Amino acid sequence: MKTVVKENANGGKGQVGGKYILDDNELNAKCKMFAEVTIAPGCSLGYHEHHGESETYYIIKGQGEYDDNGTKRPVTVGDKTFTPDGCGHGIANTGDEDLVFMALIQLD
């Protein structure tokens, strides 16, 4: 598994860590990414759009604010989000512990 840390990912604040669960040959050209993402308190993954793909998050720890194509809502453990092709999203950690979620990008 490859682990990365990005600064100001997609124009967000602070650091976002990712642990890539599957490598390219395991994704079988059907998915672009399957990863566990960690966002520290006060940090965020900036708003971005998806084209030719969709993305799903499943929250496994912490709490945050999810920007769903311009509409913001709280997310916490057990919540699922879905961003279809042509739409955008972002997420910020609003809690006092790490926000951790699974992220899956499927190719359309």
Go through each PLM region and give its residues.
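Conserved short histidine dyad/triad with adjacent acidic residue
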Residues: 20, 35-51, 85
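Ligand-binding loop in jelly-roll beta-barrel domains
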Residues: 65, 85-108
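Short acidic-glycine-tyrosine-enriched beta hairpin
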Residues: 71-85
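A short, N-terminal "cap"/entry segment at the start of jelly-roll beta-barrel domains
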Residues: 1-32, 46
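Short, conserved beta-strand element in jelly-roll/cupin
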Residues: 38-40, 49-66
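Short histidine-centered beta-strand/loop micro-motifs
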Residues: 25, 45-50, 92-94
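Short, surface-exposed secondary-structure edge patches
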Residues: 36, 56, 70-74
